[in-house]
Amino acid sequence: MSTVASVKDFVSSFMLTELFKGMALTGKYMFSRKITVQFPEEKTPLSPRFRGLHALRRYDNGEERCIACKLCEAVCPALAITIESEVRDDGSRRTSRYDIDLTKCIFCGFCEEACPVDAIVETHIFEYHGEKRGDLYFTKEMLLAVGDRYEAEIAANKAADAKYR
């Protein structure tokens, strides 16, 4: 190292130039517009295509939509869906068991796309938790309850997204 360079380094470190450069950068961003969202109090808008908690839908007459074709179970890459079906007296087939293990689910939306009758949908609900592993194992009754509770929102999101499908 040359003498000039070492003197320059000594003066630079003695005058704390790196510290002042850092302080200038901090000052520059301190007064700029904040982009951080304080989550529980503030929420950002969600897209109509947001994929959150699953729900099973019903027809207007109260009958569940799922026809037990098992396409959603077949297309699920995480193998998170389990379906068992039974044949009714009128010859139609309906599910006797429809379970989704949310600890396995990757929320890809393939189940929703594969469903020919729009029975399984992903809602805008993302604030749910489980204290035990079994709490994130949703049964048919739980999924139908979610669908019944949020049917108006689900229908509005489906209508908003219809022109893009």
UniProtKB/Swiss-Prot annotation:
Gene3D superfamilies with a match to the protein in the record: 3.30.70.3270
As for membrane topology, the entry says: Peripheral membrane protein
Q: Which InterPro entries match?
A: 4Fe4S_Fe-S-bd, 4Fe4S_Fe_S_CS, NADH_quinone_OxRdtase_chainI
Which PROSITE patterns does the UniProt record give? 4FE4S_FER_1, 4FE4S_FER_2
Cofactor(s) needed: [4Fe-4S] cluster
Q: Name one GO cellular component term.
A: plasma membrane
The EC number of this protein is 7.1.1.-
What's this protein's function? NDH-1 shuttles electrons from NADH, via FMN and iron-sulfur (Fe-S) centers, to quinones in the respiratory chain. The immediate electron acceptor for the enzyme in this species is believed to be ubiquinone. Couples the redox reaction to proton translocation (for every two electrons transferred, four hydrogen ions are translocated across the cytoplasmic membrane), and thus conserves the redox energy in a proton gradient.
Check the record and name the HAMAP family matching this protein. Answer: NDH1_NuoI (MF_01351)
Full protein name: NADH-quinone oxidoreductase subunit I
Tell me what organism the protein belongs to: Polaromonas sp. (strain JS666 / ATCC BAA-500)
